[in-house]
């Protein structure tokens, strides 16, 4: 059990974040399933913001883990989250463009003159 699991205020905050974000990951858009409330400004570094509903975003487990893989744990900031969100959105647009281009390529285009 981590130090937050027995913190009733944290549990209420986390549930409210999930509700306010409609149980939807704010990075990839997946809805439902196991979700995690992420502090924009870190839980330990910004204790005055721990339970502020403006200091949280709902993330799926995969996106939450990827954020912390990129930025580590502790001392995280809203700036890091915004940067991560922008990178994720850029990658999503690139993937959509590639998928669209692949879908619109003529079949056997390598055999055309």
Question: What are these model-predicted stretches?
Answer:
Residues 52, 60-63, 83-86:
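Glycine-rich loops and low-complexity Gly/Arg-rich segments
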Residues 41-56:
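Short linker/helix segments within small regulatory modules
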Residues 33, 56-79:
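Short Cys/His-centered divalent metal-binding micro-motifs
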Residues 9-36, 60-62:
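Short cysteine-rich loop/turn motifs with clustered Cys
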Residues 1-12, 29-34, 73-113:
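A boundary/linker detector
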């Amino acid at each position: 059990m981590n130090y937050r699991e027995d913190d009733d205020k944290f549990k209420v905050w986390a549930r409210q974040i999930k509700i306010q974000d409609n149980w939807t990951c704010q990075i990839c858009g997946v809805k439902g399933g196991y979700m995690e409330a992420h502090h924009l400004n870190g839980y330990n570094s910004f204790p005055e913001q721990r339970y502020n509903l403006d200091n949280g975003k709902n993330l799926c487990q995969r996106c939450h883990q990827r954020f912390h893989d990129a930025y580590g744990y502790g001392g995280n900031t809203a700036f890091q989250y915004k940067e991560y969100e922008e990178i994720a959105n850029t990658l999503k647009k690139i993937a959509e463009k590639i998928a669209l281009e692949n879908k619109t390529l003529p079949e056997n285009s390598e055999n055309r003159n």
